[in-house]
């Protein structure tokens, strides 16, 4: 039998979008409008739990901050909601989720925007589906002119070099760097030159700019923020590419709001590209359990 859907539309041009969207959320909330529709023999579509001003908790890998900060602010204003974003290395974010181990904890994120695919499987039970938004390559940033003539990952093991990397337990970039070094049998040689091991890549950019390091392994998007002072050498390795997935928690009481945030981010492609990310054209949702992850980056699942 044919069914018609009852929809509510809010104009892009609306000067009071927050009030209009609040009303739409009210109409759809299970304990508000949906209950009335059900009484009137409509088949209610389950909406988000009612709140005057919902608070959406987003966990995001640090690499995404320059591309999304403005978009998150605009989304919160248009929707009349609060978006509480925790930016950190994905190792730290996953560990925090695993430590909470209970999605009823109000601090457990409603949405998760990782630095790379390899940090989704550890929490796939809560985030069984992801949309791949962007990618960025991993390379070596050096002072302008490349005074030490660094060309490859192997060159980081050269004599008297001061190298900076990210911590493998705390960050995606560190984890992926360690994976590439191990896979290339360079771990011992490069490890001997490491003078800085930090949780986020922006700290490495600051350190190389002060002259305390000769070379740092970072994402291209990190380098872009300081490209007038630095040169960037792409690493020739199949693992030197990070893909950023966005996932909404399957049991979030703000699941629809999380999906609206994703749609809002997808409308702002130009911002991601301006920050140096490459946009992924096919953004169909992928099951987290089916993400293709290189064998050297596979991690134990959440217990």
What are these regions (language model features)?
Residues 1-86, 91-108, 114-126, 131-136, ...:
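Exported/periplasmic ABC-transporter solute-binding proteins
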């Amino acid at each position: 039998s044919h069914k018609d859907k009852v929809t509510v539309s809010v104009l892009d041009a609306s000067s009071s979008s927050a009030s209009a969207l609040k009303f739409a959320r009210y109409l759809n909330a299970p304990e508000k409008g949906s209950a009335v529709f059900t009484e009137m023999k409509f088949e209610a579509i389950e909406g988000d739990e009612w709140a005057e001003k919902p608070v959406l908790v987003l966990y995001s890998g640090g690499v995404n901050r320059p591309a999304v900060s403005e978009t998150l602010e605009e989304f919160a204003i248009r929707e009349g909601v609060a978006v509480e974003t925790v930016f950190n290395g994905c190792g730290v974010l996953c560990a925090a989720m695993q430590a909470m181990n209970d999605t009823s904890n109000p601090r457990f994120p409603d949405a998760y925007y990782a630095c790379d695919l390899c940090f989704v499987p550890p929490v796939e039970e809560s985030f069984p589906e992801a949309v791949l938004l962007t990618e960025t390559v991993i390379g070596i940033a050096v002072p302008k002119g490349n005074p030490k003539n660094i060309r490859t990952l192997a060159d980081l093991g050269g004599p008297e070099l001061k190298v900076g990397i990210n911590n493998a337990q705390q960050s995606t970039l560190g984890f992926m760097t360690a994976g590439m070094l191990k896979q290339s049998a360079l771990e011992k040689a490069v490890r001997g030159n490491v003078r800085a091991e930090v949780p986020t890549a922006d700290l490495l950019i600051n350190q190389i700019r002060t002259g305390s390091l000769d070379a740092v392994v970072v994402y291209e998007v990190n380098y872009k923020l300081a490209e007038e002072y630095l040169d960037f050498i792409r690493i020739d390795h199949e693992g030197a590419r990070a893909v950023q997935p966005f996932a909404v928690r399957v049991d979030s009481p703000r699941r629809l709001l999380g999906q609206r945030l994703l749609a809002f981010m997808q409308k702002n492609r130009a911002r991601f590209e301006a920050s140096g990310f490459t946009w992924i054209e096919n953004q169909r949702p992928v099951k987290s359990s089916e993400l293709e992850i290189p064998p050297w980056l596979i991690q134990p699942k959440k217990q």
